[in-house]
Amino acid sequence: MKSSSKQKATDKAEAILTGAMQEFMACGYAAASMDRIAMAAGVSKPTLYSYFQGKEGLFTALIQQMSQSDRILDEARFLQHPIHDSLKLMAIDFLDKFSGDQPLLSLFRLIIGESGRFPDLAQTFVRNFEQPVLEKLSYLLAQHPDLKVADPEVTARLFVGSMVHYGIIQEILHGRAILPMDRDRFVDGLIKLIVS
């Protein structure tokens, strides 16, 4: 009985997050309506507020739901392969996620667009996406037996920053036709810079 009610609560939270994502993407953060989110989720407004205290809580939950640094940065997988292979696996996972996940791209666009008016939301994104990835990659770069870098934190930022830039140009700004760059060529060149 308890697991059934727990599953219903999980399903309801998922429905709310799905409704919130649709509303935020359609209207932006400022114009998003809690009434429309509740309607899209098929829940009452009091139920919506019992799960998430408000619009900011909903947005934060969406960011946390979409953050998957653990999947991209699997420590055991990273440390058991030669450094070139480890970085390549990570880069391919990251870029595939970046290019293949339309909700993530939409959320990224929204955060960039709203960051001037809502810096707290942008900081929530940095805290939940960038910070964990950079911290974990810095640690892994320092631990990898095949790599000796002077500053693992700087190296992690260069690596992740290069991939984010590639994703922004190719996917968010639709630059494939203007600045074409084969993904594998980009990844191999980036890794050579780091490991040499």
Give residue spans per PLM region.
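Basic, helix-initiating cap at the start of DNA-binding domains
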Residues: 1-43, 50-57
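Hydrophobic/aromatic residues within well-ordered alpha-helical segments
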Residues: 12, 55, 66, 87-90, ...
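Short amphipathic alpha-helical segment with a characteristic S/N-K-E followed by hydrophobic residues
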Residues: 16, 54-59, 69, 121, ...
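Amphipathic alpha-helical segments that line or abut small-molecule/effector binding pockets
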Residues: 18, 84-99, 105-109, 153, ...
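Amphipathic alpha-helical linker/stalk segments
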Residues: 60-93, 139
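Amphipathic alpha-helical segments used for helix-helix packing
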Residues: 99-127, 168-173
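Amphipathic alpha-helical packing segments from all-alpha helical-bundle domains
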Residues: 119-146, 188
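Hydrophobic/aromatic-rich alpha-helical bundle segments in the mid-to-C-terminal region
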Residues: 142-191
